[in-house]
């Protein structure tokens, strides 16, 4: 069973995580409370830690499930030759997990960032199972062919130095916590939680692969998948 690093404040994440084997890899998730399921789907470069307060607030009245995508959080972080790191595979992983743990009816979806394309991809394949959907800062729509990347993402994605900064210095995680929190600085203990699963070159693989998997032209491997999600919404 994966566990939190010892240096983290356990009171901020007071849950007993669970693991389901999906496609030969261990997928970590939280499963708290009883009732109709609320499925919380994170994006890049976060993990179920992002939803820790929602889990606490919702669990008295709902079954709350917060997943860690493969390569993220406390889930396995396989090499590229063992896992494709594509949108299609992540949608399939989420569907498989929910089937195996019996969360298949009256689902309330909460999706953020890359979790939007993944969660909406899963929800739209079985719309009769969805009760409501909460969408935060995301997109599940195909971009016009040959859309230009924001300069910083283009740089991360297409230059060797960009990849080095993501996987070597964890700049994507660290930068996100600065850019994404304007009113006040994130407390040190909370920052430590966001960074904890991504403490090495190998553990940051999925962060870069998410950036690389954004489809900006019809030749990209995830282009068709994203258009299929859009068509079902």
Segments (PLM) and residue ranges:
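The serine-hydrolase catalytic nucleophile loop
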Residues: 44-55
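Short beta-strand element of the alpha/beta-hydrolase
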Residues: 36-42
